[in-house]
Amino acid sequence: MSMQDPIADMLTRIRNGQAASKVAISMPSSKLKVAIANVLAAEGYIESVKVLEGAKPELEITLKYFQGKPVVESIQRVSRPGLRIYKRKDELPKVMGGLGVAVVSTSKGVMTDRAARQAGLGGEIICYVA
């Protein structure tokens, strides 16, 4: 059986991995998953991202903790296969008043809401991370 929403599965694996205090998690890899993971790593929400090559490439994410608590307090899927959410540059949301990050898929690639605002781009809101 095929997976209906691989991005939601990725976010759930991150959420569950941190709830279980896992050091690292792995999942099937895709270009979009790697791009999202790289944005989360650049923002400091996860430690590192590694793609393990093979017949079926695996994405390995090393989770990050601060004083024994997960750095990611909440991670929430916004746009989904059944209901895509697109926003223009002036409509991009601020998560937790600017403390969190919205991951946005734009014509120039996957980036944070802040980077999209600076570049003057809108796009599909993939998820909120705080």
UniProtKB/Swiss-Prot annotation:
Gene3D superfamilies on file: 3.30.1370.30, 3.30.1490.10
Q: Name one GO cellular component term.
A: ribosome
* Coiled-coil regions, chain positions: none
Q: Please list the GO biological process terms of this entry.
A: translation
- Which molecular-function annotations from GO does this UniProt entry contain? rRNA binding; structural constituent of ribosome
Keyword set for this entry? Ribonucleoprotein, Ribosomal protein, RNA-binding, rRNA-binding
**Source organism superkingdom:** Bacteria
Looking up Pfam families in the UniProt record yields: Ribosomal_S8
Q: Which InterPro entries match?
A: Ribosomal_uS8 (IPR000630), Ribosomal_uS8_CS (IPR047863), Ribosomal_uS8_sf (IPR035987)
What's the stated role of this polypeptide? Answer: One of the primary rRNA binding proteins, it binds directly to 16S rRNA central domain where it helps coordinate assembly of the platform of the 30S subunit.
Q: Which NCBIfam families match?
A: PRK00136.1
Quaternary structure note? Part of the 30S ribosomal subunit. Contacts proteins S5 and S12.
The family classification in the record reads: Belongs to the universal ribosomal protein uS8 family.
Name under which the protein is recorded: Small ribosomal subunit protein uS8
